[in-house]
Amino acid sequence: MKKNKLFWILTVVCVLNFAAHLYFYPSLPDIVPTHWGGQVNGWGPKSTVLILAALPFAMLILFEVIRKIDPKHQNFEKFGKVWNLFVVLFTVMMAAFSWLSELAVFGKLPDSSNLVSILVCGGIGVLFIILGNFMPQIKQNYTFGCRTPWALNDEHNWQRTQRMGG
């Protein structure tokens, strides 16, 4: 899939996510849960929900900027599928996590359950497993992968580092 098409698809996902949050925003209480440690143990103003809803789009923009300012940006084309997979997984995961506060407020999450911790840790774990599988395909760049000074200066070292890191 071309990166421009993917960017616009993810932009639509982020906008729809934010619009859905805006739809439910008036029905939220003034204080919403923002942190879980087995059960809700952190609270914040309901505007936090909108900040969390905007975060996936902000990260999507940041990923595009990073791709353009990296001194070895031409290498992104060589491992574009891995980078695109990371951007898709990360953006979708952030959009999904942005719903945890609303789900807790509307009673869709058990209050004294470790479900949130399991979902967040499980999602991040799956992301790392998938990335670990694809890390050997990453070419030299200053943004993505295991970036030690030695690996950045030597192509062979870079390949070995990514393979071991994965």
PLM feature segments, named:
Residues L10, G42-A58, S113-L131:
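Alpha-helical transmembrane segments
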Residues L22-I51, F144-N153:
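Active-site and channel-lining beta-strand-loop segments
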Residues Y23-P26, F57-D70, I130-C146:
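Membrane-water interface of transmembrane alpha-helices
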Residues V65-N114:
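Ordered, amphipathic secondary-structure segments that act as subunit-interaction surfaces
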Residues T148-G165:
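Short membrane-interface loop/juxtamembrane segments of multi-pass integral membrane proteins
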